[in-house]
UniProtKB/Swiss-Prot annotation:
This is Protein BEX2. Zn(2+) binds at C125. The modification Omega-N-methylarginine is found at R50. The keyword Metal-binding applies. The gene is BEX2. Keywords: Apoptosis, Cell cycle, Cytoplasm, Metal-binding, Methylation, Nucleus, Zinc. Expressed in central nervous system, with high level in pituitary, cerebellum and temporal lobe. Widely expressed in breast cancer cell lines.
């Protein structure tokens, strides 16, 4: 058990701490006297200071913050993706045209009545 002196000392320390906290609170209240306290706004409430209202433009709070950020960041990425798809599609079209031309040229060569071009195959023929 504590003695009466120790209890009295503890009570005195607690009172001093409480007084210091009260003094700090009073100083903060005096400092913030001219400023209104910031309170959370509802969706429909917008706080405009009194006086010249044109000078202060009210920014509406972003209700769907994550959605807004995703779409703001996603737009350039989506644009790049679309450009890449267009570019890749164009490259594929060009390759398909080249392939079609080669296939047509080979098939036309087989069908055509023109004599084949001299390929020098007969020069290396070992027939007597």
């Amino acid at each position: 058990m504590e003695s009466k002196e120790e209890r009295a000392l503890n009570n005195l320390i607690v009172e001093n701490v409480n007084q210091e906290n009260d003094e700090k609170d009073e100083k903060e209240q005096v400092a913030n006297k001219g400023e209104p306290l910031a309170l959370p706004l509802n969706v429909s409430e917008y706080c405009v200071p009194r006086g010249n209202r044109r000078r202060f433009r009210v920014r509406q709070p972003i209700l769907q913050y994550r959605w807004d950020i995703m779409h703001r960041l996603g737009e350039p990425q989506a644009r790049m993706r679309e450009e890449n798809m267009e570019r890749i599609g164009e490259e594929v079209r060009q390759l398909m045209e080249k392939l079609r031309e080669k296939q047509l040229s080979h098939s036309l060569r087989a069908v055509s009545t023109d004599p084949p071009h001299h390929d020098h195959h007969d020069e290396f023929c070992l027939m007597p």
